[in-house]
């Protein structure tokens, strides 16, 4: 990913979150070195996949979601190799930064994922963008949330299947200095209403980079980030209101309510990933009627290729 100056980052509102630096004693510094080397409790280990539901039904659907931070760069970093090995039934991508007429040819080589749908801004090359790739042809596909103010940046794809509706989203970042926080709040309200309407028709699966760490357990340094994009009271409240109003359940926290150090994003700065100084910004949210079908919700923290890692959902439908 090319380095961007502060001015450009503030304008586009997509500046990666930075962690506040704190002075460390020699003892603390040694502890940090040990943790970075994997000797402390800080690193997250993805447990073995659970491929049956609570009632014993075997998983029939595997969905993966990944903010790739640029399709072309992600492919160069062997992101497609991971997808081929993971072999999802549906793959959702965010921050593709690629218009549909410039999609890399390698995407056509993905085994089975022949039904491909893309959305990108019409006037901003190399910005935002989402993709949805599926083995099965959806019954219906639509783009955006039906409001002009929010449908200019290629952030949402909706795919309807027989037993559920899948929404993949790249939610707007409030930006460095919170320059887009007011816009983000308008988005949150409109998105919530949109999802509630969808959920009234069929059970809903929402996945993607939702650009908020919901609770303090969902980021490494909560105290230092309460005024930073992704952890403001307004964004956290908006997320909570969405969970209640639609309603939706956080699949990872449903299964792992107290699991700490489970993050999906790490800034490129300050060796954040090796120290696991991260944020959980990527989610699979489910209608409550789908919870009996939930087998597992995974964070593939060892998969490289972006400043986010992929997440995987198993359902027994």
From Swiss-Prot:
In-chain residues carrying the UniProt-annotated modification Phosphothreonine: 232
SUPFAM superfamilies on file: DNase I-like
Keyword vocabulary terms for this entry: Acetylation, Activator, Cleavage on pair of basic residues, Cytoplasm, Disulfide bond, DNA damage, DNA recombination, DNA repair, DNA-binding, Endonuclease, Endoplasmic reticulum, Exonuclease, Hydrolase, Magnesium, Metal-binding, Mitochondrion, Nuclease, Nucleus, Phosphoprotein, Repressor, RNA-binding, S-nitrosylation, Transcription, Transcription regulation, Ubl conjugation
Positions of the UniProt region annotated as Necessary for interaction with YBX1, binding to RNA, association together with NPM1 to rRNA, endoribonuclease activity on abasic RNA and localization in the nucleoli: 1-32
Activity control: NPM1 stimulates endodeoxyribonuclease activity on double-stranded DNA with AP sites, but inhibits endoribonuclease activity on single-stranded RNA containing AP sites.
Modifications after synthesis and translation: Phosphorylated. Phosphorylation by kinase PKC or casein kinase CK2 results in enhanced redox activity that stimulates binding of the FOS/JUN AP-1 complex to its cognate binding site. AP-endodeoxyribonuclease activity is not affected by CK2-mediated phosphorylation. Phosphorylation of Thr-232 by CDK5 in response to MPP(+)/MPTP (1-methyl-4-phenylpyridinium) reduces AP-endodeoxyribonuclease activity resulting in accumulation of DNA damage and contributing to neuronal death. Acetylated on Lys-6. Acetylation is increased by the transcriptional coactivator EP300 acetyltransferase, genotoxic agents like H(2)O(2) and methyl methanesulfonate (MMS). Acetylation increases its binding affinity to the negative calcium response element (nCaRE) DNA promoter. The acetylated form induces a stronger binding of YBX1 to the Y-box sequence in the MDR1 promoter than the unacetylated form. Deacetylated on lysines. Lys-6 is deacetylated by SIRT1.
Catalytic residues identified in the record: 170, 209
Site entry (Transition state stabilizer), positions: 211
GO cellular component, one term: perinuclear region of cytoplasm
GO molecular function, one term: double-stranded DNA exodeoxyribonuclease activity
Site residues by UniProt (Important for catalytic activity): 282
Modified residues (S-nitrosocysteine): 64, 92, 309
Residues with the Phosphoserine modification: 18, 53
Other comments on record: The specific activity of the cleaved mitochondrial endodeoxyribonuclease appears to be about 3-fold higher than of the full-length form. Extract of mitochondria, but not of nuclei or cytosol, cleaves recombinant APEX1 to generate a mitochondrial APEX1-sized product.
Protein's UniProt name: DNA repair nuclease/redox regulator APEX1
């Amino acid at each position: 990913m090319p380095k961007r100056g502060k001015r450009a980052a503030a304008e586009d509102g997509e500046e990666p979150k930075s962690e506040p630096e704190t002075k460390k004693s020699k003892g603390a510094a040694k502890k940090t070195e040990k943790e970075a080397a994997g000797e402390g409790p800080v690193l997250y280990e993805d447990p073995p996949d659970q491929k049956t539901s609570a009632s014993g039904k075997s998983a029939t659907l595997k969905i993966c979601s990944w903010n790739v931070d640029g399709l072309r760069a992600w492919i160069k970093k062997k992101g497609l190799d991971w997808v081929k090995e993971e072999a999802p039934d549906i793959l959702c991508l965010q921050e593709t930064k690629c218009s549909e007429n410039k999609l890399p040819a390698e995407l056509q080589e993905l085994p089975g994922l022949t039904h491909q749908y893309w959305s990108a801004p019409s006037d901003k090359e190399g910005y935002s963008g989402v993709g949805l790739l599926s083995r099965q042809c959806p019954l219906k596909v639509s783009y955006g949330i039906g409001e002009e103010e929010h449908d200019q940046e290629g952030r949402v794809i909706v795919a309807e299947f027989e037993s559920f509706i899948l929404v993949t989203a790249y939610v707007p970042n409030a930006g460095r200095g919170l320059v887009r926080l007011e816009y983000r709040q308008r988005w949150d309200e409109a998105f919530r209403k949109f999802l509630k309407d969808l959920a009234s028709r069929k059970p809903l699966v929402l996945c993607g980079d939702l650009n908020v760490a919901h609770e303090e357990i969902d980021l490494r340094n909560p105290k230092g980030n309460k005024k930073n994009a992704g952890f403001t009271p307004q964004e956290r409240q908006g997320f909570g209101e969405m969970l209640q109003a639609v309603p939706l359940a956080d699949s990872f926290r449903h299964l792992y309510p107290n699991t700490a150090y489970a993050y999906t994003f790490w800034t490129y700065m300050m060796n954040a990933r090796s120290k696991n100084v991260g944020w959980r910004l990527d989610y699979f949210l489910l209608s409550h009627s789908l919870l009996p079908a939930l087998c597992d919700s995974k964070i593939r923290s060892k998969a490289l290729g972006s400043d986010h890692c992929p997440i995987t959902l198993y359902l027994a439908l």
